[in-house]
Design a protein with these regions (language model features):
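Solvent-exposed, flexible loop/coil residues
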Residues: 13, 25, 119, 123
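Short loop/turn motifs that cap or connect beta-strands within the blades
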Residues: 8-13, 73-76
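Short glycine-/Asp-/Thr-/Trp-enriched loop segments that recur within the blades
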Residues: 15-21, 78-81
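Hydrophobic core segments of beta-strands in well-ordered, beta-rich domains
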Residues: 1, 5-8, 23-27, 32-44, ...
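Short consensus segments that form the blades of beta-propeller domains
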Residues: 16-17, 45-51, 113-116
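Beta-rich accessory regions
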Residues: 55, 60-80, 86-215
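Beta-propeller and closely related beta-sheet repeat lectin domains
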Residues: 22-25, 83-86
């Protein structure tokens, strides 16, 4: 393969978008031009967190000059352990994205572990209301087994549903507005560990607490 230099597609115009832009990916999505990069050393401003991020730029592409004039920049994922995503086209035209579920700022695996981090579940990308909308690829549904359904279940205090268990779940919960202040679902719970998903009704806050999630 012989490569020829053509132009600088895009660059940080004012020095506010980190230092090196890693793993760039440029493509057209629903008639919008998108540039995905993973800039290092971003400052915590607006929707960006401190350190390494994954972001996407939206704007206009000059095909003659081969220059991308970005107009808007958004965070691609709010988690710290999502980095260097890349996309591909499925045979049916869907834009699919896979990321590295790790970050250079995260702790490297312990010496006695035989694996280090993993890749994310592939996501389908679409444009909705001027932003990228992400959903798990529809092929995930082929892995669903042993469906359990509870309807009109009234919960008071602690409640454990014996039929719902396991380390891998795809769960949909519909909560009817009622007289409650806080609603919590504890995942992967045993004597030592649990991960809590909490809805605070009064403050309209949603919290994922991984304090006791373990490694």
């Amino acid at each position: 393969i012989k490569w020829n230099y053509v132009s600088v597609l895009a660059s940080d115009r004012d020095g506010t978008l980190g230092t090196m832009w890693e793993c760039p990916d440029f493509f057209c999505l629903d008639e919008e031009y998108i540039l995905i990069t993973s800039p290092q050393d971003l400052c915590a401003t607006e929707e960006f967190h401190n350190g390494n991020n994954s972001v996407y730029y939206m704007g206009k592409y000059d095909k003659k000059q081969h220059v991308f004039h970005y107009e808007r920049v958004y965070s691609l994922d709010d988690g710290f352990d999502f980095y260097a995503p890349q996309t591909m086209l499925a045979p049916d035209g869907r834009r699919i994205m896979i990321g590295w579920m790790q970050s250079w700022d995260s702790n490297i695996r312990p010496a006695d572990q035989k694996w280090s981090c993993m890749m994310t579940i592939p996501r389908e990308l679409h444009i909705e209301q001027g932003r990228i909308l992400q959903n798990p690829v529809r092929e995930i549904e082929n892995y669903h087994r042993n469906a359990v359904c509870y309807q009109n279940k009234e919960i008071s205090g602690n409640c454990q549903m014996e039929d719902i268990h396991g380390r891998v779940l795809d769960m949909t919960v519909e909560i009817v507005r009622g007289d409650f202040h806080q609603f919590t679902i504890s995942f992967a719970q045993n004597e030592r560990y649990h991960t809590d998903f909490t809805i605070q009704k009064d403050s309209k806050m949603i919290e994922m607490n991984r304090t006791y999630s373990g490694m």
